[in-house]
């Protein structure tokens, strides 16, 4: 049936990559909180001429970099989740699975030319009579 799992790829490295991406995102979010607080403090201090305009501008620029790091971290988490989802190889159509070309525990690569198996669609069946 369509959506039925045909193969399972070891998810361990993909889980590790997802956990790493989540940790990087958490670090970036914590840094952004710190930078937001620093900019808020400097905004008051620059108005009172207690801190230089250059220091304030640097803090604002660093805040922008921290926000970009958070966005990049979110994208990395999304990518890791997508890659983890690819560890379940499912049938795209309903049909019969042909002979499997790989055995359990075999090493396969994303770029290999050999098919792992073929799914043959049985419904509808078209016949050409001549």
Predicted feature locations:
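Short beta-alpha junctions and helix-cap segments that line functional grooves
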Residues: 112-116
């Amino acid at each position: 049936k369509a959506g039925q799992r045909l193969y399972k790829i070891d998810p361990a490295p993909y889980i590790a990559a997802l956990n790493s991406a989540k940790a990087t995102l958490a670090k970036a979010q914590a840094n952004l909180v710190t930078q937001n607080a620093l900019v808020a403090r400097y905004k008051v201090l620059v108005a009172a001429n207690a801190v230089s305009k250059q220091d304030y501008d640097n803090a604002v620029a660093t805040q922008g970099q921290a926000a970009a790091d958070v966005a990049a971290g979110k994208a990395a988490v999304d990518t890791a989740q997508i890659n983890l989802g690819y560890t379940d190889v499912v049938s795209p159509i309903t049909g019969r699975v042909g002979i499997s070309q790989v055995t359990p525990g075999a090493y396969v690569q994303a770029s290999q030319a050999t098919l792992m198996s073929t799914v043959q669609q049985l419904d509808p069946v078209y016949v050409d009579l001549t």
